[in-house]
Amino acid sequence: MPDQHEADGVFVKVCGITSEADALLAVGMGAAAVGFIFAPSPRQMAPAAVADIVKRLPHETVTVGVFRDESPRRVIEIANQIGLRAVQLHGVESVEDTRWIASRVNWTIKAFPAGHRNIQRFAEYGAQSLLIDGANPGSGELFDWRLAEGVVDPSRLIVSGGLRPDNVSGAIAHLHPWGVDVASGVESAPGVKDPTKLREFMAAVRTAERAANRAGRREAAPSIQPDDGRHSTTDADRRAPTSGPDLFDWQDEP
């Protein structure tokens, strides 16, 4: 997993980054992580373009590659090529696929749509973090937060799906997650981050975490160890299993 992120606040990942300027903007405003989407999407990026951005970011930035139903070997290949510090699996990946990938990277995030039955099997996937999203990733649709109550230890939970400056504090107060993930909620257009919205989002997160701290509700962060080189292409030569049943509906993504 990436270097230890100081967990005196909510972990914030700004996803759907498409430019160096937006990556630096997010980091400069306090985001701990930036996400790059490699799946078909208005925010899709080529590995070479992401590699060029990543090398210009501060060393402590957690760079996350977001994949959907990609070949496990290809996931590891891209992670190595770019030097990604985390991998997010946001598709129909099976337990076997996820475990295979997670054994080769330092931090794996497995995403599920809110309310899906496989969330109850999260421990079987071998991922360090669970991300709960709406049914249509990238659509900006908010899900019923009650569907994420008590599904996992909050110290492993990242909440996504329709978060904006005007509602992220509610998500933090309701679910007490370790982290939040935002994309369309801080954009002026798909893949174009809006400085004002991002500033307001970060301010809302910090206000909510101060309230949570006063109430004694902040969760300890998961242990994040330095990169030990486990995401190696030599390991990827081993046989990779196949994927499982459909989970997300990406048809309505803007």
Show which residues each predicted segment covers.
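Conserved N-terminal beta1-alpha1 strand-loop-helix module at the mouth
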Residues: M1-P254
